[in-house]
Amino acid sequence: MTNYYAEITGWGKCLPPAVLSNDDLSTFLDTSDEWIRTRTGIENRRISHVNTSDLATVAAKQALARAGITAQDIDLIIVATCSPDSLIPNIASMVQKNLEIEAAAAFDLNAACTGFVYGLETGTRLIQSGAYRHALIIGAERLSFYIDWAMRDTAVLFGDGAGAVVLSRTEEAVGLQNAKSGCDAQGRDILSVPKFGTSMDRFAADNGYWDFNFVGKEIFKRAVKGMGSAAAHVLAHAGMSKDDINVVIPHQANIRIIQTLCDLSGIDQSKAFVNIQKYGNTSAATVPIALCEAVEQGHIKAGDNILLAAFGAGLTWGAGLVKWGQRVEAISESDAALPECDKSALELLKNAIELCNARRDK
């Protein structure tokens, strides 16, 4: 029986053009650039003027071009998201429609910030079964839709964006080698949007607002523990040590979490790719966006061992060990882009900020 692997052959990203800076946030929140940067490492984040599926589609087109294949070669699409355009149907089908793919398995996956790592393992296992040849694995979020813009603790953290990879079937021992995923369900309430879904009062007058529960200190402790144990598991299972890792792609939630994860794992912080300062926490999109930029900037080289680690609501956690193939250059480039945005981030958020503040004042 042939042993198949799923090589990452293409990579792409999509960041909306409207930038919301820390100084912008200080115009309507009791905060400052210094307060946010020192506690989170974040300086800017992006605010989308389009739907989550639009972000996902642009990232997917970039990944396809860099893989040197067409959309018609794709037979599996997995979109990791907790902020879809619609509940029914899934947005993977919208991405499929946008790419004009006639027939492919397409579904969404919600594991919050760990979603891309879950999706990467799921896609890899399906390709290894021999049933699929090329897969699009996408992490895409429009978290600005959920944010209570009167609540400082969460308003400063999140941003919008998408990242994507193409997985291609191969007999070479590259791609995801080992993975460990799990969920600490006892802590599911400390990071949640609890009233979105059938648990909310559908006919409530204030049905345009949802609480965003966020217990920062407890999340920090559980994030480091979850990602750390998962990372240790995949390294041990692969018979590798921390010194064998060339690059770490961690979930971009908080610079302190990234630093603590590296310190507790004994991995040099210089190996961790960090771009949280530019985009904030884009949930399921952080890992693929960071992976894409790490390749673009030359941090990932042929044959590198890459450690992925993420943590999210649920409380989900996961890690994966990826063996990069021999190609780090794009075969082609895509000119795919979002439609132009004629508003600033503050202008895009104006109505949401006013309504959130009005509710807080009641």
Swiss-Prot record:
List, alphabetically, the GO terms of the cellular component aspect: cytoplasm
Reaction catalysis annotation: malonyl-[ACP] + acetyl-CoA + H(+) = 3-oxobutanoyl-[ACP] + CO2 + CoA
Instruction: List where in the cell it is found.
Output: Cytoplasm
Annotated GO biological process: fatty acid biosynthetic process
UniProt entry keywords in alphabetical sequence: Acyltransferase, Cytoplasm, Fatty acid biosynthesis, Fatty acid metabolism, Lipid biosynthesis, Lipid metabolism, Multifunctional enzyme, Transferase
Q: Domain comment?
A: The last Arg residue of the ACP-binding site is essential for the weak association between ACP/AcpP and FabH.
Family to which this protein belongs:
Belongs to the thiolase-like superfamily. FabH family.
Assembly, in brief, is:
Homodimer.
What is the protein's name according to its record? Beta-ketoacyl-[acyl-carrier-protein] synthase III 2
